[in-house]
Amino acid sequence: MSAPISVVIPTLNSANSLPATLLSLMEGLDAGLICEVVVSDGGSTDASGAIALAWGAEIVTGAASRGGQLRRGVAATRGAWVMVLHADTILQEGWAAQVKAAMQQGPLCFSLAFRARGFAARWVAAWANLRSDLFGLPYGDQGLVLRRSDYDRSGGYPDQPLMEDVALARSIRHKIRRRPACAFTGADKYQRQGWLRRGAKNLGLLLRYL
């Protein structure tokens, strides 16, 4: 059986983080899960494109907008399943076995963890994971794996710069189930803006969007 999953990664000047993200996908290739990686670039001026090509990824380009980039990226894929992963997210070792065991149960995401120490990082991640469990509304930082048919029926990602992940999650018929494997994501925005301020901003955006 051919590998079922196409991976889509949106990038915008992501050269510093992209190699580690791509490296974490290698176990999915070894497990026969991943058939292709599509990098959807929003006009990077750094080496993001060169890095993607060096790793064997396909590149699609267009205007910088997370939703638009993801929509273009998914449109370029051929797999029966789609995995969406941010360019600063590293999947925990062992993720491929968990996906392989659970994917027939429907769409899934990973458990959020930040590449940062301290109580604030753990608290924000715990809240995000609880929200995913209760409402089936993971953020894009947690990754997403779903059938292409479910994606198509949902209407796909809207071309919008924010909350595109929540918009898609709300339109999917099946609840998104969280797996124990962690998606370790960068904490730069939280560390620059402050954990409390950034967390409150995200919550406010979510409440206004819903």
What is each of the regions a protein language model found here?
Residues 4-6, 36, 167:
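Cell-envelope/extracellular polymer assembly enzymes that use nucleotide-activated donors
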Residues 41-49, 89:
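A conserved acidic beta->alpha catalytic loop
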Residues 61-77:
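Glycine-rich, basic loop-to-helix element that forms the pyrophosphate-binding segment
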Residues 82:
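Short aromatic/hydrophobic "clamp" motif used to bind/position activated sugar donors
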Residues 150-154, 160-178, 182:
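A short, conserved alpha-helix in the catalytic core of glycosyltransferases
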